[in-house]
């Protein structure tokens, strides 16, 4: 059975007295190697400088520890995580709706909307809706969607070919990488 960890120690890295290795490689705050020594010696060095001993890599042989200010280190890590989160872009699915009897100008407007969506990194769902007996002309809707895919060839690749779903014909486009 695994030992029970205290709640506040679960996700914290090994620092200071929590480092339980017979020998460790110690690196100074500015990156200079201080050598291989016992953790107690490294703790004395860290205490002299009013800094913490932080385990950086336990996979190395011997494990690598750094003498640094742990509070500052933790703040920097959180700051990097926030920056990385800001730079992430989640791609949404934007929809462009039309009918198969669409006029030329209206069609061009829909294509321009789709271009804008694709340039911003979003996927596009092109939908052609049918009303009443229009569903008999699904081949015209398929031709329209293929024309749209052809017009957007520079910006998109077809993720899902035109497919009929109920009273709609749908095609998915994703931005080119």
Swiss-Prot record:
Residues in coiled coil: none
InterPro entries: T_IF-3_C_sf (IPR036788), T_IF-3_N_sf (IPR036787), Translation_initiation_fac3_CS (IPR019813), Translation_initiation_fac_3 (IPR001288), Translation_initiation_fac_3_C (IPR019815), Translation_initiation_fac_3_N (IPR019814)
Location within or outside the cell: Cytoplasm
Lineage top rank: taxon: Bacteria
Task of the protein: IF-3 binds to the 30S ribosomal subunit and shifts the equilibrium between 70S ribosomes and their 50S and 30S subunits in favor of the free subunits, thus enhancing the availability of 30S subunits on which protein synthesis initiation begins.
Assembly and binders: Monomer.
Name assigned to this protein: Translation initiation factor IF-3
